[in-house]
């Protein structure tokens, strides 16, 4: 069931005191509830869905996969836009899959080395040093990713504008 945020009642947090629950288990907080996974067990066929399908997050990249709907009346320009979006999404998923794999491997190595040195648990302060070192080591990769991401999205925007212009011209032609 689709819910629109505008249709939801607005509740001010100042109206009543709500208990706060944090990531760590706090006394007096209810245990976290396991929510069932909602969605389809496999990707639907793009020709059978009525609109774009956004799936659950991918386990490796943490990105939500898209299935782009298209019909038989898709123009060449609309097809090139859809294929460009699919190409950029595949590139993005590939980047974040490799990045997250590298991050988790280095994080495990960091924790393992600290445990081998005699520390039973790694503190949040020690982990913050790892996070900063990881970001410092990969800043060039992140800059290049951002530049590539902006360029690819600019290409998508120009194609989307051309598709919309084509639709407007076709609509004007039908009305005249």
Curated annotation (Swiss-Prot):
The keyword Cell wall biogenesis/degradation does not apply. GO terms for cellular component: matrix side of mitochondrial inner membrane; mitochondrial membrane; mitochondrion. It comes from the Eukaryota. The lineage of its organism: Eukaryota, Metazoa, Ecdysozoa, Arthropoda, Hexapoda. InterPro entries: COA8. May be required for cytochrome c complex (COX) assembly and function, COX being the terminal component of the mitochondrial respiratory chain. (Microbial infection) Required for optimal replication of E.chaffeensis. Keywords: Membrane, Mitochondrion, Mitochondrion inner membrane, Transit peptide. The gene is coa8. Belongs to the COA8 family. It is found in: Mitochondrion inner membrane. It is a peripheral membrane protein. Pfam families: COA8. Residues 1-23 form a transit peptide. Disruption phenotype: (Microbial infection) After infection with E.chaffeensis, results in reduced bacterial replication rate and increased survival. This is COA8 family protein CG14806, mitochondrial. One of its GO terms (biological process) is intrinsic apoptotic signaling pathway. Its main location: mitochondrion.
């Amino acid at each position: 069931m689709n819910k629109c945020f505008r249709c939801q009642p607005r509740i001010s947090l100042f109206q009543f005191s709500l208990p706060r629950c944090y990531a760590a288990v706090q006394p007096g907080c209810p245990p976290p509830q396991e929510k069932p996974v909602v969605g389809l067990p496999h990707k639907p066929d793009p020709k059978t869905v009525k609109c774009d399908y956004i799936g659950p997050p991918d386990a490796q990249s943490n990105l939500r996969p898209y299935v782009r709907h298209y019909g038989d009346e898709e123009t060449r320009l609309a097809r090139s836009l859809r294929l460009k979006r699919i190409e950029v999404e595949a590139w993005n998923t590939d980047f974040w899959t490799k990045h997250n794999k590298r991050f988790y491997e280095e994080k495990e190595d960091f924790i393992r080395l600290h445990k081998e040195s005699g520390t039973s648990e790694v503190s949040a302060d020690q982990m913050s040093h790892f996070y900063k070192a990881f970001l410092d080591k990969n800043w060039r990769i992140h800059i290049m990713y951002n530049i590539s991401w902006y360029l690819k999205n600019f290409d998508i925007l120009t194609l989307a504008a051309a598709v919309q212009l084509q639709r407007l011209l076709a609509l004007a032609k039908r009305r005249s």
